[in-house]
Each structure stands twice: as C-alpha cells, then as structure tokens.
C-alpha cells in the first residue's frame, strides 16, 4: 500500500509540475480569470482533457494484489486494473471550469479508459460522470460568487470524489470478490493522493492569482501616487520647468537610475545618473529616443549600444522610452534609465506606460484649455472644459482606499476615471456630442459616485434608442444627475431614486432628470438656473452655466424647465433634434 502511495505521488507530481508551468504563462492566467467565458471553457477542456489522457496512460497496473509499475499503458489485459490520477484531473476541471468543462473532460477520460480496457473498464466511465457532476456543481457555485473553492474544500471534494469511484467499483463490478480485493488495495492511497493533489493544484492557482492581485494593487498605488504628485505640472504644457519637477518626483518614487523627458527635438530635463552629458536644452543624443518618436511606440534597450548614446563611458545600460502624445501626435518622450539591465522588470514597463498615458492626457487637456481661449465661442467651451477638482480628488481618494481591499474594483474605477476625463477633453473641443457619448459620460460619473456612496441612490434610464445619435451639449445630462445627487435628498440614505429620460417629440429632443427628493423651496424655484443661489449644499452655478450654454447654442426656448414639490423635482429641456449622421452628411456637402 505504501509502495502504491509513493508511485501515485510521482504521477501527481507530474500533473502538478505541468500545472505550475501553465500558471506562469500569461495566456493561461488570463484564461483562468475569464473561466466563465465559453472560449476559455473550451480551452480548459483541451488542457484538462490532455491531463486526463496523461493520467490514464501513466497509471499503475494492478493485477490481483500485485502492483506492476510500468511506463505507459495503451492496453490492459482483461484481469488487470489501473490506479491513476484520472479522478484528480476531472475533479479539478470541475472546480475550476464548472459542470460543462467537467462533463466534457469526464467523457474524454472515461472513453479513453474504456479503450485501454482491463477489468470492468466501463465502470470508470460511469464514475467519471458522477465525479464531474459533483465537482462541477461546486465549481459552478464558486464561479457564481466570482471566486475559487478554498484549499480545504478542494481537498475534501477531492477525497469525496475518489470515494465515489470506490463505491462505483463495488456496486457495478461483475466480480464482487475481485472488486473488494482491488478497493482494499487502492482505496486509502488513491483517496489520500486525490485529496492532496487537488489541494496542491488549487493552492498553485490561488497563490498565483493572489500574487497577480497584489502586484496590480502595488502598481495601481504607485501610478496613483506618482500621478497625484505630477498632475499639476503637465497642465501648463511640456516645458523645462514642468518636465524637471515631474522627473524629480519620478526619480524619488521609482527604482530607476535616471529620468529624462524630451520634446520631439530637445532634452527638456535629465535628472540622475549621466546628467553630465545628457544635458537639458540640448538636442536628443540617443538613437533609442529618436526611434520611439518616429515609431510612436514603446522602445526598450538592454545595452549601451542599443540605447545609442555616443558619449564614451556612459554608465546607462538599459532604458524604457515611452512616447507622449497629444491628439495622436507624438510630442515628446518619457525615459527611464537603469545602470543595471537586470533591474528592468515588467512592472517598470507597465508603470512607465501608465504614467505616459496620464501625462499625455494632461498635456492634451492643457492644450485644449489654451486653444479654447483663442476661438470665437471661448465662453461656451470654457464652461464645458471645467473639471471639478473636488470630484477628481474625491475619486482619487476613493480609488486609493479600494486598492488594498478590492484591487480589481480599483482598476475598474481608474478606467472609469480615465474615461470621464477623456470625455471632458472631447467635450472641451465640441459644442455638441452624441446622446450615446453623453450617457457613457454619465455612467462613468455614476460608477465613481456609487463607489463613494454605495447603495445611497439608484439611477434608472428611459431612453429612446432611436435618439442615441442625437446631438446634445456635453455634460448636460451629467450636470442634471450630479445636481440631483448633491441637492435632492439631503441626508436621506435610502429610497433615493433618479430617472433620466430622453425621447423625440415634435418640438425636438426632450431631456429630463427627475428625482423623489425633498423638492426645492418655492422662494428659490424661480432663481434656480438663472442666477447663483447660496445654500448649505452649493450655489447652483452648475445649472446656471448649463442654462447659459443652452441659451447660447439653441436660444431661450431651450432653457431649463424646473418643476418641484414636496414629492420631488423634475428638470427638463427641449433642444432642436439634430442627428450625428445628418451632421456628417452636411459637413461632407460643405466640403
């Protein structure tokens, strides 16, 4: 029995080794994180199907009470049986991929086991189906909860599934005496091995996923910390002063030897190692930077020759160069240098890419703000381009708080914040955008607000789908929703409802935002949207600004209409109906 246990342990070791190798492949990690998708499940079927085949033909032959340790079995004599790790592969496939994956793997494994033959081979197809159903059930419950079974639960399920196989051998065997002899010999080793193997397999998966989450949390925290400190400088444009301050902050917070920032031609700043010949206000001297600017893609170098610095004895051995963009045009580069090429890792590349995207957004936003002051409708565009700094820092603080608790949620909110600012930037360049884009902006805003105040309010949408292409002023609906969230409910924490509606009428596109809040006092109702109204929760300047934009774009008829009583408030406006496709056709005719 001990000999069989050791031999089975060797077979489990092979499966675990392959699993460990797979969990260090990025594609497999991605597949495990998306295991509920049908494409990933088909891939899991292929992988665990191969595992089950390996388990079958590397089994240990049992003949009576004799253990025969061969190498590979493609066929068994009628009186022989096979001790293997087949149950382990079926069980783990179910715990990871659910019943669909488990049943498919069970059929593959069971049919191949029947093909190999031996005593009562059909039993193992039957037991495989039972095992797949049980493990698949627990795997399905875990997937619904967006998690994996714990190691202890996995070990218990692994042992239970092997017990089920032993019961199937005893119940369905044609030769009860032979079945009892076989079970007495293999039961304890196989139940123990299956339990241990399942636990180890799950521990590899769980530890790898946990390590990935911790790495993402650290990266997100680093990006936020760097972004929070460097954001003010790039709004003023890409110049020597802003570049130097930002580079000094990056050098202090990252494990790099030097940081440089350039425009398309010159070095704006270089701080750290090799600053004696990488001098600001001089032309770019490295070929690597020139290639990054020309191609518009990230470039890496792991030797002085690849960097392309012509200065003799330059101590820089490795570099990451990321382009900075404004309106899809490369305007400069962010460069991270290392004196030891082995210091460069994947996290550094991800961090550099993230910083470059944030810096590019700030440069683009700053440029848009500058340009908006030079064009004819500067007043309207300046109102559109305003970004509430309190909202930004509240969002940053919310994301920072979530990093250690739920890194995946923090990553999603960071993407929503990026989408929010990108929409702000697009709105700063246009008097109107499509209703669909405006609703996307509202959803990004709501994601961030609901993260700050979970379950505080519920927003529902009643939108005529044929109106998605209608043109509306940027941030019009967002301002109305934001106004309702901030002012309608006061300190009420429950049953707060907001309804956003949009439909086409004879008079134009009708947009309304209503709430079930406390209502607006009668004495203030006539002033809202026309002038600043001072109160404990604000001044009403957002509605005033929106009203001014509506008047400027569409005339007095488009002004906000406000109806309020003790049961709630409705703010609406009716604007001329213009479709995005119609605007494109008219634009092409004008050309």
Curated annotation (Swiss-Prot):
Keywords: ATP-binding, Cell membrane, Kinase, Membrane, Nucleotide-binding, Phosphoprotein, Transferase, Transmembrane, Transmembrane helix, Two-component regulatory system. Member of the two-component regulatory system LytR/LytS that probably regulates genes involved in cell wall metabolism. GO terms for molecular function: ATP binding; phosphorelay sensor kinase activity. Its main location: membrane. Pfam families: 5TM-5TMR_LYT, GAF_3, HATPase_c, His_kinase. Residues 379-461 form the Histidine kinase domain. One of its GO terms (biological process) is cell wall organization. The keyword rRNA processing does not apply. The modification Phosphohistidine is found at residue 390. It is a multi-pass membrane protein. Coiled coil: none annotated. The chain crosses the membrane at residues 2-22, 42-62, 88-108, 114-134, 151-171, 185-205. The lineage of its organism: Bacteria, Bacillati, Bacillota, Bacilli, Bacillales. It is found in: Cell membrane. This is Sensor protein LytS. It comes from the Bacteria. It is an enzyme of class 2 (transferase). CDD domains: HATPase_LytS-like. The gene is lytS. InterPro entries: Bact_2-comp_sensor_kinase, GAF, GAF-like_dom_sf, HATPase_C_sf, Sig_transdc_His_kin_internal, Sig_transdc_His_kinase_LytS_TM.
């Amino acid at each position: 029995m001990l000999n069989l246990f050791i031999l089975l342990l060797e077979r489990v070791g092979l499966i675990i080794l392959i699993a460990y190798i797979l969990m260090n492949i990025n594609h497999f990690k991605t597949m495990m994180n998306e295991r509920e998708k049908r494409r990933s499940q088909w891939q899991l079927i292929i992988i665990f199907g191969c595992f089950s085949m390996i388990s079958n033909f590397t089994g240990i032959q049992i003949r009576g009470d004799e253990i025969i340790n061969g190498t590979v079995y493609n066929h068994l004599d009628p009186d022989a049986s096979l001790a293997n790790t087949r149950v382990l592969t079926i069980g783990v496939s179910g715990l990871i991929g659910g019943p669909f994956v488990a049943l498919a793997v069970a059929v593959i494994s069971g049919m191949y086991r029947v093909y190999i033959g031996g005593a009562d081979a059909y039993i193992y197809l039957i037991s495989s189906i039972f095992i797949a159903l049980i493990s698949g059930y627990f795997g399905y419950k875990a997937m619904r909860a967006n998690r994996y079974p714990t190691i202890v639960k996995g070990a218990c399920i692994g042992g239970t599934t092997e017990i089920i196989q032993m019961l199937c051998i005893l119940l369905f065997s044609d030769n009860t005496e032979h079945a009892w002899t076989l079970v007495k010999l293999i039961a304890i080793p196989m139940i123990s091995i299956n339990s241990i193997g399942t636990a180890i397999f799950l521990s590899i998966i769980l530890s790898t996923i946990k390590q990935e989450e911790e790495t993402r949390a650290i990266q997100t925290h680093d990006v936020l910390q760097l972004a929070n400190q460097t954001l003010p400088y790039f709004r003023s444009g890409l110049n020597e002063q802003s570049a130097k301050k930002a580079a000094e902050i990056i050098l202090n917070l990252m494990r790099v030897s030097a940081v440089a920032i350039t425009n398309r031609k010159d070095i704006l700043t270089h701080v750290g190692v090799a600053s004696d010949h990488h001098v600001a206000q001089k032309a770019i001297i490295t070929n690597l930077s020139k290639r990054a600017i020309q191609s518009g893609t990230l470039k890496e170098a792991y030797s002085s020759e690849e960097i392309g610095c012509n200065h003799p004895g330059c101590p820089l051995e490795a570099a990451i160069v990321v382009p900075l963009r404004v309106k899809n045009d490369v305007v400069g580069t962010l460069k991270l240098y290392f004196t030891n090429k082995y210091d460069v890792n994947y996290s550094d590349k991800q961090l550099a890419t993230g910083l470059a995207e944030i810096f590019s957004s700030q440069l683009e936003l700053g440029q848009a703000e500058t340009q908006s002051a030079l064009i004819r409708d500067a007043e309207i565009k300046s109102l559109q381009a305003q970004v509430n700094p309190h909202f930004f820092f509240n969002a940053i603080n919310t994301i920072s708080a979530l990093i250690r608790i739920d890194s995946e949620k923090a990553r999603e909110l960071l993407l929503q914040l990026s989408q929010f600012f990108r929409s702000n930037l697009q709105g700063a360049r246009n008097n109107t955008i499509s209703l669909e884009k405006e609703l996307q902006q509202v959803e990004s805003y709501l994601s961030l607000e609901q993260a700050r105040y979970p379950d505080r309010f519920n927003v529902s949408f009643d939108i005529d789908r044929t109106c998605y292409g209608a043109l509306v002023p940027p941030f019009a609906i967002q301002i109305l929703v934001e106004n309702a969230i901030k002012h309608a409910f006061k300190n009420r924490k429950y049953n707060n409802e907001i309804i956003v509606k949009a439909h086409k009428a004879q008079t134009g596109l009708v947009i309304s935002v209503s709430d079930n809040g406390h209502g607006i006092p009668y004495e203030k109702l006539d002033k809202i949207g026309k002038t600043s109204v001072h109160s404990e929760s604000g001044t009403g300047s957002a509605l005033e600004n929106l009203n001014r934009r509506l008047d400027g774009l569409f005339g007095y008829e488009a002004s906000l209409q406000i109806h309020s009583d003790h049961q709630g408030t409705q703010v609406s406006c009716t604007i001329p109906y213009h479709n995005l496709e119609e605007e494109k056709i008219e634009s092409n005719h004008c050309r």
